[in-house]
Amino acid sequence: MPQWEIVGGADKGGVLVREGQALGSPATKDRLSTGATVEEVELVGERLHYKLVEGTGTGPAEGWISIKVSGKELAVPKEEDVEIGPPGEAGPVEVDEDLKKKIEAEHAKIKDKFELYVPKYKFLKYPLADCKMRIFCFHNAGSAESVYTGPKTPFTDWVKETGKIEMIALDFPGRDKLNKATKHTTIETLAPELLAVCLDKVSDGKPYLVWGHSVGTWVAFEWLILIRKLGLPMPKAVFLNAFPAPHMPVSMRPWHRSKKLSDDGVKEELMSWDSGHFTGAGKVVFDEPGWKDTWLPMMRADFQLYDEYKFKHTGVPKFDFPIHAWHMEGEHFNKKDMIEMWKDWTSGTWDTCAMEKMGHLTCFYNPEYKKQYFTKVVENMKGYYDAL
């Protein structure tokens, strides 16, 4: 029988169970616990007759639940675990012509919205008449492009001094100028959209680098997988910091799935990512009404980008460009060996290190740490720029 996972009800102690299919039938005394697995006996519209899989949760052994309430999922089909493994050896990848046509068609529809996704583009006086290189930046969860484009940093200063580098720092929908856009909860839809909107900036042959942080590394990874499938140029190098490689087994993921967390649980999870930041400058995100109106919905969506991520690239050819993947020494969840798994993804040069004392976010928000972090990134990027 098909199985379902209970993902709703965290704020109420579980999902309401009724004795019969009708919404007016008697409710059971106990609720079905969030995280439980149930077997489908019968599915009628959005009403599920279930039997609880022993040992997976608590609540009535059998009953009826709604799989959705007001558009919010309470139960989702349980997917079979897919074997996850490393890439294969480097080699050619056949162009996916259907995918290419699809991305090109989407580009034609949304290319005029480019500056909504890259809000600093005109402010930084782009496009450049003599652009020599571009740097594509992908931000972390709950953040925005401003972590890269903030003024007077070693990164922005260097880019400005060259006068020949365009910084393409992308916003994910649901923030800044895209505040009213639907937030993505899966990289499978986010990465193609981010490629479509800037396709002409990748396909024109200008050399480029990629810098991703935290979940931005997985978004960048899927973005690069798509670029390769389209037969477009690969980057000169990538910087994928503060997050494990995407082929790390699901069982090794140290964080909690946000779908199963109450609102207070999401707050606790966020705090755990970098308590140094969220007990300091970052604590303002918990102030009301900003927390419930802005930050909580954003975190719930952004967390799912990695919580629910399904890796589907076992055995595909590894890349041949250099990968820099650095660990933040003060991390709570991520460990150095998780970050080092990125080495599996290149046949080229590989670089890793631990950034002393830095947390998952303080590397961006602590002025001293940010200066050190950005200086090191720039020192490495200069080598690729000077070699052009």
Annotated model-derived regions:
Residues 5-18:
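Short, basic/aromatic beta-hairpin or loop at an interaction surface
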Residues 84-92:
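Extended acidic low-complexity intrinsically disordered regions
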Residues 21-27:
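Short alpha-helix capping/helix-loop boundary micro-motifs
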Residues 25, 36-37, 308:
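Eukaryotic intrinsically disordered and solvent-exposed regulatory patches
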Residues 30-74:
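SH3/SH3-like beta-barrel superfamily modules
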Residues 74-85:
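Intrinsically disordered, low-complexity linker and terminal regions at domain boundaries
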Residues 91-213, 217-388:
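Domain-scale detector for complete catalytic domains at protein termini or as standalone homologs
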